[in-house]
């Protein structure tokens, strides 16, 4: 049939059926999809929430399967070499802006994840069953004769035009982990559906997304909806992800309904996982050609009272956990602020292109805390930063909770303070006058120097002669030797000060700084955790 006649026919049938032309094409694509081969069953979010609630009232069943030897013993290189056949992509027949492909089970991915395609008009779902014909094994050593039965999948990835079937922009793989890219196309930090007992007396629990349901989008849509069922020994959950793949960012609106099977010591909402090895202020693990190595450089918080917080990340010598109490936070996230290649000199992992991740609550979260876990790491392949929201009210068996929030995967958060922001933090030897770096004579008294740069917020428009006052507090020791320097290159200011110990304590020093003029606050609040050396190490020679 001629393309124009096909369009006319589609519009005529659409008028008869009540579907739009694009909706009809989407329905046709769903009906004829070669990936979804299961029987049609009714599906909606209300039924999924009921299913999750009912599941929480039953004993947990570990669904990890014994994989065939060819999959159980495979290397990461072999696993990554398994390719999905683009001819069997979920929305191949739609020939639209989005498409979905699935990850194979194998290696440590043993939990079979069930996938379903949903017709948004009829609300009927069909399962996509695993079969080897969906994948390409030519570049692997996989013995396909061992691949018998419905092994399920381990996750999925999303593609966006014009690079359908080439470069994915979003992926869900392993437990409840997922991540997305911004305009650079570079993956970075990850998010999770739920965190349980990350920093608790018992072992951390990693819930699994065990099933997904994908609503078929309209042909020209860059937005789609996916539902997920979460399961673990301590909790179940029903999730709705409204995912908008914009030109410069991916935005997810998440509606999470969580049911507690057991009492949960620490529940982590909107958890995110990142890596910080070294940066401008932390050089302990930076003996490489790279000036900085990190997926994120700070935890940013917009508190419920309106205060903006910048907390630079650390790679501590021993595990550190910090809780920042709040009520109805306006947002928080792990941010990669520096996107200059020169700051990383990296042509493999491209840290200069890594996105930030910002959480924006869309429901009232009440009292709780933004928690930050920093774990020692010796290399960039090990994630060592975790951040999430923990409700103040204890979670007991039988409790049901609902959290709504948006996730923004973008170069920088979608919102920022109107005040000056921290541009960079630096730390080094103290106790001497700038311009007279120790050579023949080191300082007689040991100290640690900090340089905090502020920019934006109208600092470049302050009247000449405006007095800039740094307000600094510390949990122990003392701070002095203040300097306020003009930085023309960033149209801002550098605050210099030294910290001096007043005891032998090696407890972390909690530093807090903002700048003001007279009674007007000029900047967000800088929080920093410094780890002083042992008394015998407080010397320069």
Curated annotation (Swiss-Prot):
Keywords, sorted A to Z: Periplasm, Signal
Main location: periplasm
Gene3D superfamilies given in the database record: 2.70.98.10, Immunoglobulins
Subcellular location: Periplasm
Top-rank taxon, per record: Bacteria
Biological process annotations from GO: beta-glucan biosynthetic process
Post-translational modification: Predicted to be exported by the Tat system. The position of the signal peptide cleavage has not been experimentally proven.
GO molecular function: carbohydrate binding; catalytic activity
Any Pfam family: MdoG
Extent of the signal sequence: 1-29
Annotated GO CC locations: outer membrane-bounded periplasmic space
Role this protein plays: Probably involved in the control of the structural glucose backbone of osmoregulated periplasmic glucans (OPGs).
Family, per entry: Belongs to the OpgD/OpgG family.
Protein name, entry field: Glucans biosynthesis protein D
Organism from which the protein derives: Pseudomonas fluorescens (strain SBW25)
Higher taxonomy: Bacteria, Pseudomonadati, Pseudomonadota, Gammaproteobacteria, Pseudomonadales
């Amino acid at each position: 049939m001629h393309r124009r006649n096909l369009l006319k026919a589609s519009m005529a049938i659409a008028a008869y059926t009540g579907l739009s032309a694009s909706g009809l094409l989407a329905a046709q694509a769903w009906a004829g999809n070669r990936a979804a081969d299961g029987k049609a069953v009714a599906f909606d979010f209300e039924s999924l929430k009921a299913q999750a609630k009912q599941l929480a009232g039953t004993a947990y069943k570990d669904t990890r399967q014994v994989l065939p030897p060819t999959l159980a013993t495979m290397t990461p290189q072999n696993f990554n070499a398994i390719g999905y056949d683009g001819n069997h992509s979920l929305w191949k027949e739609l020939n639209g802006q989005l498409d979905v492909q699935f990850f194979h089970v194998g290696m440590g991915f043993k939990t079979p994840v069930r996938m379903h395609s949903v017709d948004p008009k009829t609300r009927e779902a069909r399962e996509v069953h695993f079969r080897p014909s969906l994948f390409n094994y030519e570049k692997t050593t996989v013995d396909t004769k061992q691949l018998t039965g419905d092994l399920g999948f381990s996750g999925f990835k999303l593609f966006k035009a014009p690079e359908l079937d080439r470069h994915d922009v979003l992926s869900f793989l392993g437990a409840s982990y997922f991540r997305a890219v911004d305009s650079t196309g570079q993956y970075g930090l990850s998010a999770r559906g739920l965190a349980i007992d990350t920093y608790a007396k018992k072992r951390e629990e990693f819930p699994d997304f065990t099933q997904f349901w994908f609503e078929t989008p309209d042909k020209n849509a860059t937005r789609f909806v996916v539902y997920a069922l979460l399961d673990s020994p301590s909790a179940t959950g029903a999730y709705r992800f409204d995912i908008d793949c914009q030109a410069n960012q991916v935005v997810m609106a998440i509606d999470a309904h969580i049911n507690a099977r057991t009492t949960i010591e620490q529940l982590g909402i909107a958890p995110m996982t990142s890596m910080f090895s070294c940066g401008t202020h932390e050089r302990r693990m930076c003996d490489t050609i790279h000036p900085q190595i990190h997926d994120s450089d700070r935890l940013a918080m917009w508190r419920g009272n309106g205060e903006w917080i910048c907390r630079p990340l650390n790679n501590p010598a021993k595990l550190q956990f910090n809780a920042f109490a709040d009520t109805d936070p306006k947002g928080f996230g792990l941010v990669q602020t520096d996107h200059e290649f020169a700051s990383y000199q990296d042509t493999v992992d491209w840290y200069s292109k890594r996105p930030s991740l910002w959480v924006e609550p869309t429901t009232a979260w009440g009292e709780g805390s933004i928690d930050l876990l920093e774990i020692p790491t010796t290399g960039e392949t090990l994630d060592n930063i975790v951040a999430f929201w923990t409700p103040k009210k204890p979670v007991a068996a039988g409790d049901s909770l609902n959290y709504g929030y948006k996730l923004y995967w973008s170069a920088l958060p979608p919102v920022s303070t109107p005040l000056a922001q921290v541009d960079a933090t630096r730390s080094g030897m103290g106790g001497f006058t700038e311009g007279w770096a120790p050579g023949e004579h080191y300082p007689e008294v040991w100290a640690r120097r900090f340089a905090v740069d502020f920019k934006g917020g109208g600092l470049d428009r302050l009247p000449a002669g405006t007095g800039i006052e740094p307000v600094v507090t510390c949990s122990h020791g003392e701070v002095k030797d203040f300097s306020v320097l003009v930085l023309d290159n960033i149209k801002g200011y550098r605050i210099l000060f030294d910290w001096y110990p007043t005891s032998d304590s090696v407890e972390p020093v909690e530093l807090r700084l903002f700048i003001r003029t007279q009674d007007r606050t000029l900047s967000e609040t800088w929080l920093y955790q410094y780890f002083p050396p042992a008394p015998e190490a407080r010397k320069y020679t």
